[in-house]
Swiss-Prot record:
Belongs to the TRAFAC class TrmE-Era-EngA-EngB-Septin-like GTPase superfamily. TrmE GTPase family. This is tRNA modification GTPase MnmE. The gene is mnmE. Mg(2+) binds at residues 234, 255. It comes from Moorella thermoacetica (strain ATCC 39073 / JCM 9320). Keywords: Cytoplasm, GTP-binding, Hydrolase, Magnesium, Metal-binding, Nucleotide-binding, Potassium, tRNA processing.
Length: 462
């Protein structure tokens, strides 16, 4: 219902610097005016939009002062929801905030449902559906590049691309249906429409091609550190984390289980997994660790194969490399600081061992080469494609990907039917379905149950 006024806590519950209670709806200003006494100046109902007022929240029944607050007023349509919005900035105590919220609810507001503020922004035309989902992507972003992609969506770059494709598609549909309804006046459909349909399909394919990178931005890159025992895998993990997370020892087999930590590497969120050294062992506990390492490697998006530059390439290193050749790899020569002699030979051996795989020499102990490693990770993930300023927005949402895949299926079917000379009404059925799937992304054809599912993922105050 858009004819009532909603309220909710817009900041995390508990103690903090401030707590913000947000109201939206036609009665938002009037409701707060009944419980807000400004320190000076006129009543809140005459306050100009986008201004702050200092005062006290007073219970009109008991006359008790509940908190000293700052109240901001944003009048429709120039607000997040395109409705009148009031935000009450309370002191950050849980009790004071709760009492103010309860008073607001007793005075005429209704407690908002999860995501209802953003849903109102969508229903009032302030945001389309892809932009509304971008709000949640911004909140959940775990990397700088993920945040950049989410902001790109919020600015409407994805929506514009989808809208352009949909507009061209509906134009072809209009021509096709006019040809069916008025064959004598309109004549046959221009063959150029088929060529444009192929271009629309290519545009959908370009968007789908960004999904893998988009998935890594939202889910994080699974990175396994592997190698024979005692090559410095745990030291590398500690160096990347800049903390002593894993036990480091000269005794082979010290790491007997996988250790997982999250960090930023090359602008991406990486779920870094330090694995037990890969070798044949009679030790039961170490064998369990090796088995878990193999499972982690199988699930990894990227594998860092670590070798010891000090001791040089060993047969065991070659066996490790052979066991992971089906993965995306970076070869890391560690302990560069301990190579006192023949450094050029050691690096040449590393190059020969790595072959066509990217390689980098590092000193986990001294922190040398880690920036180069981050760049290698970035190059592999982006594949030479720069995220910022790209013409093609990234697909980071699994719902968008599914809609595009369904759209593609119907476009391909329509093109095939057109090429085979099948009846125009059959072609139109596929084209309408393709257009509906594009509309689902930006919300022009979204069903109520889909909206319920999307906005239920939001917190109550958003």
């Amino acid at each position: 219902m858009l004819d009532d006024t909603i309220a909710a806590l817009a900041t995390p519950p508990g103690e903090g610097g401030i707590s913000i209670i947000r109201l939206s709806g036609s009665q938002a200003i009037a409701i707060v005016a009944k419980v807000f006494k400004p320190v000076k100046g006129p009543d809140l109902t005459t306050t100009r939009s986008h201004t702050l007022r200092l005062g006290f929240i007073i219970d009109p029944v008991s006359g008790e002062s509940l908190d000293e607050v700052l109240v901001s007023v944003m009048r429709a349509p120039h607000s997040y929801t395109a409705e009148d919005v009031v935000e009450i900035n309370c002191h950050g105590g849980a009790l004071a905030t709760s009492r103010v919220l309860q008073l607001v609810l007793r005075t005429g507001a209704r407690l908002a449902e999860p995501g209802e503020f953003t849903r109102r922004a969508f229903l009032n035309g302030r945001l389309d559906l892809a932009q509304a989902e971008a709000v949640l992507e911004i909140i959940r972003a775990r990397s700088s590049r993920g945040l950049t992609a989410a902001l790109d969506h919020l600015r409407g770059n994805l929506s514009r691309k989808i809208g352009e494709l949909n507009e061209r598609l509906t134009g072809i549909l209009a021509a096709l249906e006019a040809s069916m309804d008025f064959p004598e006046e309109v004549g046959e459909v221009d063959p150029e429409n088929l060529a444009d349909l192929r271009r629309i399909l290519a545009g959908v394919d370009r968007l789908l091609a960004t999904w893998e990178e988009g998935r890594l931005l939202t889910e994080g890159l699974k990175v396994a550190i592997v190698g024979r025992p005692n090559v410095g895998k745990s030291s590398l993990l500690n160096a990347l984390l800049n903390q002593e997370r894993a036990i480091v020892s000269n005794i082979p087999g010290t790491t007997r289980d996988t250790i997982e930590e999250t960090l930023q590497l090359g602008g991406f969120t990486c779920r870094l997994i330090d694995t037990a050294g890969l070798r044949e062992t009679a030790d039961e506990l170490e064998s369990i660790g090796v088995a878990r390492s193999k499972k982690a490697i199988a699930a990894a998006d990227l594998v860092l194969v670590v070798v010891d530059l000090q001791t040089g390439i060993q047969d065991e290193d070659r066996r490790v490399l052979e066991s992971v050749r089906d993965k995306v790899l970076i070869i890391i020569g560690n302990k560069l600081d301990l190579v006192a002699h023949d450094i050029n030979k050691k690096l040449a051996d590393l190059e020969s061992f790595a072959g066509n795989y990217p390689r980098v020499a590092v000193s986990a102990l001294k922190g040398k080469g880690l920036d180069e490693l981050a760049r290698k990770v970035q190059e592999i993930v982006l594949g030479g494609r720069a995220l910022a300023g790209s013409d093609e927005p990234l697909i980071t949402n699994a719902r968008h990907r599914a809609a595009l895949e369904n759209c593609r299926e119907h476009l391909a079917s329509a093109i095939k039917a057109w090429e085979e000379g099948l009846p125009e009404d059959l072609i139109a059925i596929d084209l309408w379905s393709a257009a509906d799937y594009l509309g689902e992304i930006i919300g022009t054809t979204a069903r109520e149950d889909l909206l319920d599912r999307i906005f239920s993922d939001f917190c109550i105050g958003k």
